[in-house]
Amino acid sequence: MRETLEALSSLGFSVGQPEMAPQSEPREGSHNAQEQMSSSREERALGVCSGHEAPTPEEGAHTEQAEAPCRGQACSAQKAQPVGTCPGEEWMIRKVKVEDEDQEAEEEVEWPQHLSLLPSPFPAPDLGHLAAAYKLEPGAPGALSGLALSGWGPMPEKPYGCGECERRFRDQLTLRLHQRLHRGEGPCACPDCGRSFTQRAHMLLHQRSHRGERPFPCSECDKRFSKKAHLTRHLRTHTGERPYPCAECGKRFSQKIHLGSHQKTHTGERPFPCTECEKRFRKKTHLIRHQRIHTGERPYQCAQCARSFTHKQHLVRHQRVHQTAGPARPSPDSSASPHSTAPSPTPSFPGPKPFACSDCGLSFGWKKNLATHQCLHRSEGRPFGCDECALGATVDAPAAKPLASAPGGPGCGPGSDPVVPQRAPSGERSFFCPDCGRGFSHGQHLARHPRVHTGERPFACTQCDRRFGSRPNLVAHSRAHSGARPFACAQCGRRFSRKSHLGRHQAVHTGSRPHACAVCARSFSSKTNLVRHQAIHTGSRPFSCPQCGKSFSRKTHLVRHQLIHGEAAHAAPDAALAAPAWSAPPEVAPPPLFF
């Protein structure tokens, strides 16, 4: 009781003597209130009591003084109660004791001297807005609720990468959980394909691909998507947004995964090696496409002609051939008639040409052909020039023609027309020779072909005196001097100097004879053997001896015959040893071509 009176006196209240209070139930109630206060802190915070009698007039003064500091506070509701329900002395005792204990608790909170805070082996959490609120700088020691935050530094963004795919993670635990999906150990597996997922919601989204459900349509085009994230990513193609810039070169990308793949070009990282050869790749998709070369897999098949492709983009380009009818192929004997009109050597792409040049309006079926054509309009012009003439220098846009209209084909000289190398769809032959009607799939091949008729051989071997009409033939011939045989057979290990020779040899193991004669139905493993065989039916002997005039159906027979005259091999003029111009009589149908 003395402590209570001293506390009231320290607050500026005038407190009477204890004997002034009546020795009745209020004193006992006051004593009971003190016992309840010491038993529980919750009862001290209530500040409401009941069951006491009204104070005497002498105590009224004390009650008014006790109520004075409560005006406008939480105990204002107690004033509306009848007098005597909550004695002011008891309330003041509780109020003072609670405030004193809270103040003492705040003063006693100190970090013990015998304890120290050690750095945790786990990575520091991302404080985010807490770091800004408490003014904690990354990597610098700080204080949060009395605990020293020392040793916390900025972590790498995603230091742990998955070896199976290109995803990266911030901690090893998440990486291990992700790797379980590659092993098929996820808790949620798709009942249709068996793919594993860590969450059931992800599995439900995946099952839309099996049902064909695409609930998110694009407002700009007709495409629909199974996930909203895919739609958001697709919309960037319409808006042109590229929110992910490269820190090295400033190039921007629409997807974060594309940025990660691009950054490997700066670091030189190629984490995906081929198990069959020594090549390495930056993306796993590139590795999968490359491995089809070793396995021979062609998973993309055309529904109209059953032709297969290794890449999906090759199938898409091929399908343009079927969208519109291609040009009619001229017959081989169309040039025999002097009044027949020679077919135009201008290439015709048998399908839509969606890639148009913005400068001259010329359209192309392939995007890379458009890029090659646009070099004519830019300053670099033709970066690959001829060492012997001016062909290949920078030309103007009007000078760019698909092919030369001269019957002799494009020449090599300052006044010759430039040739834009164009390519027909894979397997199609849209470039035809006006002299013999032979078709080619590439404009450059047609540009080299007239040398067969003119006998021109501009490429000479430095080891011997032989000359060739094309550079690839010269390169293949040079292997005869060096002994290089880079093409090996996987079945028997035999090596060849040319890839075509290897392909011809592999028919021995497979037993394939795709070239059949249209007259006798005899099959051959190579087209060359078929052409030689057809000379039996046509009676053609294109190789004649200049000494005696005897003709032969094969060049090797002519060379062997010339030994009789005492001449060395290959002594005949180049024009006489040119490729034979096979002329089939009208009664013999030309053989079908198999490619």
UniProtKB/Swiss-Prot annotation:
SUPFAM superfamilies: beta-beta-alpha zinc fingers. It comes from the Eukaryota. Residues 325-343 have a biased composition (Low complexity). The keyword Cytoplasm does not apply. Residues 1-67, 313-350 are annotated as: Disordered. GO terms for biological process: regulation of transcription by RNA polymerase II. It is found in: Nucleus. Its main location: nucleus. There is a cross-link at K97, K368 (Glycyl lysine isopeptide (Lys-Gly) (interchain with G-Cter in SUMO2)). A zinc finger (C2H2-type) spans 160-182, 188-210, 216-238, 244-266, 272-294, 300-322, 355-377, 431-453, 459-481, 487-509, 515-537, 543-565. Keywords: DNA-binding, Isopeptide bond, Metal-binding, Nucleus, Repeat, Transcription, Transcription regulation, Ubl conjugation, Zinc, Zinc-finger. The keyword Repeat applies. It holds the Pfam family zf-C2H2. GO terms for cellular component: nucleus. Disulfide bonds: none annotated. One of its GO terms (molecular function) is DNA-binding transcription factor activity, RNA polymerase II-specific. Belongs to the krueppel C2H2-type zinc-finger protein family. Interacts with STAT3. Enhances STAT3 activity by keeping it in the nucleus. Transcription factor that promotes adipocyte differentiation and suppresses osteoblast differentiation in the bone marrow. Enhances the osteoclast-supporting ability of stromal cells. Binds with STAT3 the consensus sequence 5'-CTTCTGGGAAGA-3' of the acute phase response element (APRE). Transactivates several promoters including FOS, OSM and PPARG. Recruits a histone deacetylase complex. This is Zinc finger protein 467. It comes from Homo sapiens (Human). The lineage of its organism: Eukaryota, Metazoa, Chordata, Craniata, Vertebrata.
